[in-house]
Amino acid sequence: MNMKKLLSLLLALCMVIGIFAGCDKGGEQAATEATTATSAEQAEVVDYAASVKLDETSGRAQIQLTQSGIKQFVDGDTTHFWVPSSVMPGGILKARYLAVNTPESTGKIEEYGKKASNFTKEKLSSAVSIVVESDTATWDADSTGDRYLSWIWYKTEENGEYRNLNIELLQNGLAIASNSAQNSYGETAVKAIAQAKAQKLNVYSGEKDPDFYYGDAVELTLKELRTNTAAYDGMKVAFEGVITTNSNQSVYVESFDPESGIYYGMAVYYGYALNGLGMDILKVGNEVRIVGGLQFYEAGGTWQVSGLQYDAMTPDDPSNIKCLSTGKEPAYPETDSEKFLGKLTIKTDDAETEHDYAFLAMNTSLTMKNLQVVDIYTTNNPDSASNGAMTLTCKTAAGNTIFVRTMVLVDENGKTVTESAYMGRTIDVRGIVDYYDGNYQIKVFSASNITVH
């Protein structure tokens, strides 16, 4: 009898343990299901750029444009648009995107700066309609006083919906917050940033940017190098541009800056350091990355970059010069004497500075027309490589004096060109902005770059 009771108790105990084990397994299953649901919620990606809607009745200042209304892409968060003068005096609206701050691509280059810039260009270049919108009823300037804080909307199909490019940059991790919560779409902007961080996209990825230079040089634009040259004296620098001229073991490299609307350039001395594939990189019309040391060239009174290298055995070495693309035409923009001898104000986020235009345009290509040659000096020194080179003193219709310095020029028959070819004539020239003996001048490298009227 006692044995039967004991067996009954043991059986009951096993049943209870089984029930609890079953309950525990169910608890584990419930917890697993809850975790799976949470993960699914976390994995759900929201297209925040499409979730906000353009309200054309909001009362905020707006202007609708087509793709032809784009004047210039500057970087990831700044674009210039053609607008009626009733919207903006001068007909140009310089839009600084609200709520975003993309990495730099126009001064000192930052990681993902080029990617952000290309992203903006790609999106707006495919648009059939663009709306630039203020956050208020008026166009509000940023700290520079020259750019206007804007939302940028675009659509790629006539019957499509507008997307908000500012928020699209944020949700793709191509911009960081910039007063992102204090605006009309602040809540959505903050969510877009949080999602980009959760997905570890681009600037939040912790990974290297494949388009960024990771060498030991300071990567910057030619504008930054030309406007703050002394700050980089003796430093190793890296920059990109198009080769316009190759002469006397030097090349001239230039790039266009849409913010100031001019080209910036630098003389690059390669000497005897390069041959073969390295020299192929330095062909006129190639877009290149130059890496070298910046120094002041005392004999010429100008800045130059030198110390170039190219090792064919290690082509990916960040210290190598590099060809980025080919077939680019040197610009040679037409420039008049008033502009050449005038001043230009450069605005940045921190300051506004005035420079001689020719100082900023040093080492860049230009065309100047209708120059009346009134005097010529010819170098007469048989021991000099410049023997036969000329300095032409020219007058313009505005009464300005322009100096044109030539190399030793030869005609199509191989004969040296002399003063008689130009004295008293009206000429058009194509050359490089140069500086000598206290004067800016136009340096001409070939007789084909002087057209006689």
Specify the residue positions occupied by each region the protein language model found.
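OB-fold nucleic-acid-binding modules
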Residues: E41-T57, K197-H453
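C-terminal motif of bacterial Sec signal peptides marking the signal peptidase cleavage site
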Residues: G18-G22
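Electropositive
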Residues: E44-I167, G265
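Sec-dependent signal peptide hydrophobic core
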Residues: L7-C14
